[in-house]
Each structure stands twice: as C-alpha cells, then as structure tokens.
C-alpha cells in the first residue's frame, strides 16, 4: 500500500468518525 491510499483511507476514517460523533452528540445531548 502506498502513502497516498493510506492517507486517503485515514482521511475517510477521520471524516466518518467525526460525522458519526457529531450525530451521536446531537441526538444524545
């Protein structure tokens, strides 16, 4: 795996986690 695909995967993971956390916080609090 090269650095570009690794960085892209990390970016998508961070974005998905951030979005899920925002939705969870909004519904939870």
Curated annotation (Swiss-Prot):
Pfam family, one: PetN
InterPro entries: Cytochr_b6-f_cplx_su8_sf (IPR036143), Cytochrome_b6-f_cplx_su8 (IPR005497)
Topology of the protein relative to the lipid bilayer: Single-pass membrane protein
Membrane-spanning residues: 3-23
One GO cellular component term: cytochrome b6f complex
Keywords: Chloroplast, Electron transport, Membrane, Photosynthesis, Plastid, Thylakoid, Transmembrane, Transmembrane helix, Transport
Subcellular location: Plastid, Chloroplast thylakoid membrane
GO terms for biological process, alphabetical: cytochrome complex assembly; photosynthesis
Entry's Gene Ontology molecular function annotations: electron transporter, transferring electrons within cytochrome b6/f complex of photosystem II activity
Protein family membership: Belongs to the PetN family.
Record note on quaternary structure: The 4 large subunits of the cytochrome b6-f complex are cytochrome b6, subunit IV (17 kDa polypeptide, PetD), cytochrome f and the Rieske protein, while the 4 small subunits are PetG, PetL, PetM and PetN. The complex functions as a dimer.
Function description: Component of the cytochrome b6-f complex, which mediates electron transfer between photosystem II (PSII) and photosystem I (PSI), cyclic electron flow around PSI, and state transitions.
Full protein name: Cytochrome b6-f complex subunit 8
Species of provenance: Phaeodactylum tricornutum (strain CCAP 1055/1)
């Amino acid at each position: 795996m090269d650095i570009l695909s690794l960085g892209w995967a990390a970016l998508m993971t961070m974005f998905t986690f951030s979005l899920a956390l925002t939705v969870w916080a909004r519904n939870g609090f």
